[in-house]
Amino acid sequence: MLVVLAAAACAPAHGAAYEAAFGAAARDEGAGRFEAAARGYDDAAKRATRPRDADQARWDAAVVTTRSGNVAAAAGRFEAIAADATSEHVAEAAYRLAALRIESGDADLGWRDMEQIPRRFPTHGVGHAAVRRLVQHADEQGARAGLEELHALERDLGATELVELIAFATAEHLEALGDDRAARDAFVRIADRWPYPFGAFFDDALWHASLLDEKLGLYQGAIEDLERMLRQRETTSLVGSYERQKYVPAILRIGELYRDRLHDRPRAREAFHRLYAEFAHSTLRDEALWLEAALWHDDGDADKACGRLGTLVREFPDSRYVPCALKQCPDLERARNSAAPPECHDYIARMTESPSERDEQRDGR
């Protein structure tokens, strides 16, 4: 009870008239009565006792006017907010005004306005959105035009936080243009300049660098890119491992690169086993055991292969690999309550083939 009273005491006093008007406007908006909602928000702005509340009501009126389809009125509202230095919505209003002009037939003025958004508001979220939109617009004329737009943005914004986004998009464009070596080097520079945990593109940059290293025939370099990413892996006693999106694909690719590109089967087995042993929350742990067992089997060590498959059958009784494991190792037994498929499917066996073997199968050789 005391907590509730304390929270109520700390709540801002909006004023009864403002709250009534704002609530009525919100109900009109929810019911699709957008013109009435805009008038209601205008009324709330007049009744506000705090400048911040009035500012929010004016913003909501502009947004709901856009929803009403009255483009001219919405543009006028956003323009007024963008010109009000006291508003908390200046940057958002400027962006929405530019976007509205682009989408409603005044594209030339809209794109000129959009060009100024990241330059005026480099630390605001709309700056990031504007950069992406400007590059996407330039890309309509081809990747080379997009790259030129990025170079122009870098000249003006190289000292701002937007330069990281610009650098990553530049590397992507170099890759799209087929300049693999320059793109690879650009991605590595991003990881160097903005390392984890501060770099927003650290993982993605190393992932792209690894793909390009593989394409360039630099297989060990491709592995090192991925291992560099995985060295930043964090653990916590509360929720297990903190797994970012690229971690599991990275360790899986390491195994595949050792197996298929470097033909280093022991290290491939080690990588696949790491996926099983170290990534406790991954849904690919059963696949990792299957891939590791396949390498033991191909090397003629049936005991090790069946040992790994036994772990698979015990720990993952519902896995799609269970019937294939039982087929390879007849001494293994399916769990009584297993929901695994009844039969081993051929596509699972093909998962262990190298790229050249898959090509031969496809070409009928």
Task: Describe each region flagged by the PLM.
Residues 6-365:
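Acidic, polar-rich low-complexity tracts and alpha-helical solenoid repeat scaffolds
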Residues 1-3:
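Sec-dependent signal peptide recognition
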